[in-house]
């Protein structure tokens, strides 16, 4: 009886394997398995995040790309205008901007493990939601899972760049705090309120960190769109199988 059972089992497995081979040979649609969807989505996320982090982590990854270059907030224009009036002032301002972007580039080099942790923990349900979601579904998943940890990675590096001296022993942060402190005193006074002046509440290092992360996720979204729409961007068989179906 046991021999008959194992013989039938062997025949069944052989038939299944042959059927799969025939379906693949003649390009007959084979439904995606849960394993394929999960593996394909994890690979897509790995490719997308590696590409984004590598590009932004290179010299001028942020600084040389106008789409993601991190600039001082609009409220800092008065600082920029005043420093620009002194000899060499424009270079001082641009040096600050460059240092901020260099800090973001350094942080991007270390973003990989943060993304990999989120990718590793992705469930089957997450995978199907991403597969059947919009063109930014994978990016949105990563944003939700990694943003706080990435903020903690980027923020200290940007904070350090802001604490460096720019002119006369004064750092960007000190100039910012002095400027906004004086402005807010006026804005919050009776005369300021009568004139409808608004206090500046921008936390400079937090603002710049958010801008850096906006750029990172923009690049990931671009890569996701490519993988979904362009067969050339599907660099291996599992991506072709999942996104080509």
Annotate each language-model stretch with its function.
Residues 22-104:
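N-terminal Sec/ER secretory leader and immediately downstream segment
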Residues 12-15:
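C-terminal motif of bacterial Sec signal peptides marking the signal peptidase cleavage site
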Residues 17-20:
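Bacterial signal peptide processing site
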């Amino acid at each position: 009886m046991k021999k008959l059972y194992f013989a039938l089992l062997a025949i069944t497995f052989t038939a299944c394997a042959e059927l799969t081979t025939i379906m693949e040979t003649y390009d007959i649609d084979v439904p995606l398995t849960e394993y394929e969807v999960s593996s394909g989505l994890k690979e897509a996320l790995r490719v997308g995040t590696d590409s984004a982090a590598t590009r932004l982590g290179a010299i001028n990854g942020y600084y040389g790309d106008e789409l993601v270059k991190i600039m001082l907030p609009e409220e800092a224009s008065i600082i920029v205008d005043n420093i620009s009036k002194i000899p060499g002032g424009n270079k001082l301002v641009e040096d600050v901007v460059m240092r901020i972007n260099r800090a973001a580039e350094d942080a991007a080099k270390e973003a990989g493990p943060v993304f990999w942790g989120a990718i590793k923990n992705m469930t089957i349900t997450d995978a199907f939601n991403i597969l059947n979601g919009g063109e930014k579904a994978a990016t949105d998943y990563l944003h939700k899972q990694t943003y706080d940890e990435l903020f903690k990675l980027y923020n200290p590096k940007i904070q350090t760049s802001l604490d460096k001296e720019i002119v006369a022993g004064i750092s960007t942060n000190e100039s910012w705090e002095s400027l906004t402190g004086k402005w807010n005193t006026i804005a919050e006074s009776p005369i300021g309120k009568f004139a409808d002046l608004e206090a500046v509440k921008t936390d400079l290092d937090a603002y710049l960190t958010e801008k850096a992360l906006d750029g990172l996720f923009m690049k990931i979204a671009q890569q996701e769109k490519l993988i979904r729409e362009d067969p050339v961007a599907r660099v291996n068989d599992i991506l072709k199988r999942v996104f080509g179906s």
